Structure formats: structure tokens, C-alpha cells
Amino acid sequence: MATEKGHGRDDEERVPLTRGSTEFRNSIDSFDYSSSTASLSLAVIDRINNSTQDAALGEKGPRDDDDDRYWDDDVEYDVEDADYIPSGGKPMHKSVKIALWTLLFLSLGGWSLAFVLFIFRSHDTYETPISSEDNISSGGLRGDRITLDDVLGEEWMPRHHFISWFPGPNGEDGLLLEKDGPGSTGYLRVEDIVSRKDTKSSKGSIVLMRKNTFTVGGETVICSQVWPSPDLKTVLVLSEKKQNWRHSFTGKYWLFDVDTQTGQPLDPAAQDQRIQLASWSPQSDAVVFTRDNNMFLRKLSSKEVTTITSDGGVDLFYGVPDWVYEEEVFSGNSATWWAHDGNYIAFLRTNESAVPEYPLQYFVSRPSGEDPNLGEENYPEVREIKYPKAGAPNPIVDLQFYDVRKGEIFSVDVADRFPDDNRLIIEVLWASNGKVLVRETNRESDILIIAAINVLSRTGKIVRKEDINALDGGWVEPTQSTRFIPADPSNGRPEDGYIDTVIHEGRDQLAYFTPLDNPEPLILTKGPSEVVNSPSGVDLKRGLVYFVVAGNEPWERHVYSVKFDGTALQPVTNVSESSYYDVSFSDGAGYALLNFQGPKVPWQKVISTPANENPFEEIIEQNNHLSRKLRLFSLESKVFQYINIDGFSLPVLERRPPNFDPTKKYPVLFYLYGGPGSQTVDKKFRVDFQSYVASTLGYIVVTVDGRGTGYIGRKSLSIVRGKLGHYEARDQIEVAKKWAAKPYVDESRMAIWGWSYGGFMTLKTIEEDGGRTFQYGMAVAPVTDWRYYDSIYAERYMHTPQHNPQGYDSSAISNTTALANNVRFLVMHGTADDNVHIQNTLTLLDKLDLANVDNYDVHVFPDSDHNINFHNAHKIVYTRLADWLVNAFNGQWLKTNNPTPNDSLFRRAATWAGLSYNFKHLH
């Protein structure tokens, strides 16, 4: 659940409680790519345009009649969930039928007239307090409505080109790797972005691999991922990739020679054994790899493999992280770092022998790929995972070093470091001349130390220490974005240094520390805007730092540059427009891939940076297919604004249905994530489940980034520490009250939903609210007690349970009386969720059982992990959400409380069965 600030959650399930992707070993494959108010006439048009929608939601759409939104209990109607369909009453009298048919024709005539007037009348614009994005679609009233299949598939997904910048072997800037594009001359190529000319030939690129397959000893190798060596002479190839956890995987590794276009096993003596991790030396002369949790070294000058460690195994990891470090610290599968000169390798030794195990059961599949023993075919496969829950023993991590020339392992003691059971190592950064910076925190992640180690002298010291808890009551997020700045006296840099993100005047800002042991930095950025996962690029020749900020408003992203001395702050993107950009820079930062991500149709182009004397610009993607679709469909409009709650100005996004009419009454769905440092209110282009709810179902969707979320200041962020859910739930409820008071909102039909942390927040909100504002909630894969979640994440925001038992008690979902006061809520969870264990949902169900609470529905997905996608589950989970929401706003769930038999139906059934019964008992 590690939340990376600034990571937009395009897909609710994709980055639930966990961080976004981080760059991994320069792999070209490692890019991660996230109505009740509608008139009858509109509903008819929707039926014509979207027959597939009917299949998903059933024949009956949301009612339009605000005064009679809930149908009488004794009237038969057709909805998908047959368990909740009351039986019909007596047959109608003929005169009643005639009267009803007459009324129906008169009503249709009236609706038709109203429909014509609605089309041709002049529409008033609804004013927004801050900024309103006009509906980017131009389909208008007659435009198609998106279907659930549309948003679950790739119909509305922007195309992204997977460009991987590559440092030239001779210092060239602007080189990039490309794979298998249209009309390409080879599977893997390196190109000069400007000249598109190859220094070896006139073909415009250097072809590293002509095909994505090759043969070794009669075995056909199919590339899964590829990593060229820094000198571009050899390609490290992964085949037969098999996923392990979210970021880790195993496979077979090969060395592919560019000149001969032939391959060989990375380890010729163990060709068929699966490897967990492999990475190039900076000099291209060796590959270090981990297999069965032990480390090995293969030098290209020999086919022999050197064993670095031999005692690795089930409880001892070398060079790769265990589950919790993979998930919550590195967001990746590597804990190995080469020194720049290739003479040393730093790596983590992780001992998790004391970490308790959690069993994951697989009832349908067998992820191990192994056949069960005879007679055990009908038993679930069980995978034990070392998972440290809050307060439980953590894995013990040590930083060790391998001297490549001497072939020996050593460690360096540093005085006053955290003890083994109170230490997290969150970043390792090589400097020059055998120096390495190590970022560590205590177990509760609120005290930061930076240690400088010299592997040549095998000495080390603490050069910087910050008590974040004392500073603002907050914590340290584990990031790996610190940049080493080498000394260059000719360019005004007499000493080595590094650029880091620090807390300055209540915001995250960039700071330059030089020399390495100087704890007092030069602050490079100031003001109300916060930097995001920065620095993004460094131009050492020109002395410039490039970075991304949450612009004038927190929902924006813009790119800036500043000099190493903090002067000449300049925007790279057009800051006069409220936009959302992302960027990646070439190795020398002379060029950049600029990604415009919204609010309009995304595009990509390669540009020269402003300091580059040779201007260059090339558009590589315009997403014309999305522009065409927008002309055909009617999508929601978006309103961005701030709402003040308890003195905090909170970003709010309101999605309004097409042809929004402020004189009507709309149901409202709140969608949230809300995890610490996260952001959901942003200006990215996205057509997602929320778009479907607003555009097709015709409901208003509101998203609030409450206290605890990112980019609205440290004061707002840190206040949630130790009491997760308290302030966040209050913010959702208070904003919901403001929406309930709006003239266009039906306050009796309000729901809230979220996934993962958002699932926790859904339950916490309806628990705190007790049915006073929200009537419905939908929680997917929720945490229900932070004692059940992993230690590194939970303790960062809640302290340990031993330190803060009352905080854990109050944050747990436990007030069953309050939950019973809601009309109904839905909980869904995957049984094989390795992140948020189904234990969370099951223990909540037990509390509800003990309290005799039954106003909820549960859907369990066998063998699905946190993403819920096993055996068609991905589609089912969203179909279930949509159907359940429609039934809720149709008043369907009001009929499930204290159900009684239909008198006339029971009489008929009893008579048919020849039974006698005292019907007075029914009254």
C-alpha cells in the first residue's frame, strides 16, 4: 500500500495501497504504463445506442420521478438481482388497464414535447467556483454513451510510446532505445533522436537485435525483456518470465552478442534454472545476478560463474527484496547497486527468519505449476508468505559490499545507526571514489539519517539526521529519487554533492547538499508549489536541475528548471494553462520526452530542453483515435473547486452528467482513495468507471482529496498520523453535507465507494456517518484493522500498535451499530490477496454476525489477488459495482430490511399446497 506521492490512480485496483512504478534497470520493457435524472427520452436513446449496456445493468434503468423514486412494495418489477424481487399482486381490472394505457400515451406525448423543447432551448451555463472543464466530448445530447466494456477495455486508453533513454557509450546525449515499431528495421534499436543517423552506417539506427527470437543449442528463446549493455555490444535477455509478486519475477537469462546475433546462457552450467534478478556492470564486462536468493557474478571474459553468497535460502535474501521491502520500500525487485567504476557491488542482506508467515490459499488454480501429490488433488494449494504485520518482527536488513577484484564480502560499521530491529534501509546511492550514501529510518519512519560510507577505507559516518516527527508530526516516505552531483571545479562545483527533497516552509522542495557531508543545504525551490518525485533530470554541463511541480493548483503538473545555485527558475511547459504533464529526460538532459496527460487528449513529443543550443521538436503521438471518439460520445463535464473544512482548503472534483440540468435532482456517488500522500483529484485525461457512472448512468460523481492526501501542504498531510480514517472520514462527510444541500442533489440517494485504502475509507466514512448523510457504501479489498496490514506501511502512519494501541482501536472498523444505520453496503475481496489479506473482510463479517447486522452484501473472488482479475473477476467486480449502485439508487435495497411474505402470494401458495394456516400470524 505504499503510496507514491503524485502517482495518479487511473485504475482503482492497480495501485491500491501501494506505490506507483519506479524505473527499473533501464529496461525497455519496464515502462508502466494506472440515470435517475435522465428523462425517459434520454433513456430510450441510451437503449438504442448502447444495447450492451442493457446486458450489463438489466432492463430497468434508474427512475426519473423524484417524488416517487421508490416503487411500491406490492408492484412487480424486473431487476437483475432476483433475490430481491417482491411478487406481484392481484390481476388488474380491465377498466384500470384502459386508464393506465391512456395515461401512458398522454405521458409519452408530453415527454416527446418536452424532449423537443429541451433540444432546441438555449442552455444556461452552470457557474463553477474555480475552474470548469467543458465536456471534452462533442457528441452532444445525441452522442453515444460509453459502456462498461468500453472503460474496462482499451477503447479509451491513451496510447503511450515506450521510449527508454540510453546514455551513449561515448558520452552522446539524446540516444534512445526503440522496440519493434511499424516499419522498423529490427526488433531492438538505438537511435539518435535528432539526426536519426547511426555512427556506423547510414541506416538511421543501430540494430541491436534483428528479431525477438534466437536459438541456443536447439532451444528457441523468445524475448520477454531486454537490457543492452552500456557499450551496446551485448544484450541481456529475459525469457519465460513468470510473475512472483507485484514487482518481482523469475525467468531464464541469456547474453546476446550484437555483432554475431547469437546468444548464450547467462550461466552455461545452469541454463534451465530460473533467475530472480540480473544487472549489468557500468563497464559492460560483467553481470551480477540472484538465483535462489544467492548472488553470482558472470564476467563476459569467461563462461565461469563466480559464487558471491551461498547461504541464501527461504529466510535469507541477497540482492533482492523480500515481500515487504518489494511492496513498501523499493516498489521493485532489486536490492543490488553497482558502483560507477564497477569495482564494488552494494546489496542488501535480508534476514526474515523471525517474520511470521501468512497462508495464501488457492482453491482453483495452482500458481506453483506443480501437480499435487496423489490423493491431494482436492485440497487447495497453500503458499506461505513471510508477511510482517503491524507490531510483528520485521525482516532485518544489512547493507553489504562485494569487492569485485578481490572477490570478498564486507560490511562497514557506522556509529549511532539504528539497531537491527529498528532500522529500515530505503535508498542506496553511489557517489564517486568509493563513496556511497545510505538513507535509513527508524522502524516508525519518522527519524531520517544519511550515512556516508567509504568502501576504500571501509569507514562511515552519519552526515545528516532529521527528526520529522519533531518537525511537523509527520513521517519519511521511502523514495529513490536522490541524484548524485559529481564535482566539476571548471563549472563551479568544487565538491561532490547530491540533490534531495526536503521539507521547507511546510512544503516538499528541492535542496542541494555539497559537499556530501554538509547537513545544511541550499534550497533550490520555494513557494506554495510542491515538487513531485524530483529531480527528474540533471544537466551537469549547464548546471541545471529539471523537476516537476504541482503547479498553481494541486491538480496540475508542470515542468521547471533551476540552476544549481537556486537562480534562473524557468518553466518548461506552458504554465498559463491548467494542465498535467509528465516528463523523462535523456541522460545529459539535453532532450526530453514530454507527456501531456490532460485534461484534453494526451499527446507526446520529444523536445530539446531550453538550454540546448540545437532546438528540436518531434510529435510522436497525438491519440487521434481518442479525438475521433470524443466527437461521437457524450461524456461528463468536470468542475474543479476547493471546499474549506476546519480551515483546510480541500481539492474537490465534481463530474456532472452530459447536459447537466441544475433544476433537476441527481443522485451522488463519492469516489475516493485518500491514502497518505496520494492524489485522486487531478487533471489527467481519463475515461474510467467514474466516467461511466456520470456519463451513462447519469449520476453525479464527487471526489475529495481530504486531509492526509498530497500536495496541499505538510500541515494537512501530517495531521492524520496516528489516527488514520478520522479526519479523512470527517472531510468526506462534511463535503457530502454541502453537496446534499445543493438544489440539484437528491440528498436521499448518496453513496460512496473505494478500493483498497479507498475501501477502508468507504467503511470508515459510513461508520462515522452512521447513515445520516450517506445511505450506501461499496468497499473493495478494504483494510478493516491496521493491525492486519504490513508493518512498514502501517507503522509509518500509525506508529506501532505497542506505541499507539488506542489509535489502532479507533481506526479499526468496529462500530457495528453505526454500520447498521446505513441502508446497505457492499464488500468485495479476493481470497488470494497478498497485499490486503481477506482476513480484514472476514473479521469484519464476524463482528457483524455477533451484532446481528445483516444490511450488507458480500462478493468473494476465488484465487484473485489485490487486483481482482482471476477468471473474469475484473469485469465482474465492476459489473457488480454498477448493478449494485443502480439498485441502490432505484430504492431496491430499501425493500430488503425486515422483509415479510406477500400476503396474497402466501395464501395462494398455501392453498395450492393444500395447507391450512392462521394468516393472523402474518399481521
UniProtKB/Swiss-Prot annotation:
Entry-listed glycosylation sites: 135, 351, 574, 815, 902
Ranges of the Cytoplasmic topological domain: 1-99
Topology feature Vacuolar, residues: 121-923
GO terms of biological process kind: proteolysis
Catalytic reaction equation(s): Release of an N-terminal dipeptide, Xaa-Yaa-|-Zaa-, from a polypeptide, preferentially when Yaa is Pro, provided Zaa is neither Pro nor hydroxyproline
Swiss-Prot/TrEMBL keywords: Aminopeptidase, Glycoprotein, Hydrolase, Membrane, Protease, Serine protease, Signal-anchor, Transmembrane, Transmembrane helix, Vacuole
Membrane topology: Single-pass type II membrane protein
Transmembrane segment boundaries: 100-120
Basic and acidic residues bias (residue ranges): 1-16
Chain segments carrying region Disordered: 1-21
Cellular component aspect of the GO annotation: plasma membrane; vacuolar membrane
Span of the signal peptide: none
Subcellular location: Vacuole membrane
Example GO molecular function: serine-type peptidase activity
Enzyme class label: hydrolase
Catalytic residue positions: 756 (charge relay system), 833 (charge relay system), 866 (charge relay system)
Family: Belongs to the peptidase S9B family.
Protein name per the record: Probable dipeptidyl-aminopeptidase B
Organism in which the protein naturally occurs: Ajellomyces capsulatus (strain G186AR / H82 / ATCC MYA-2454 / RMSCC 2432) (Darling's disease fungus)
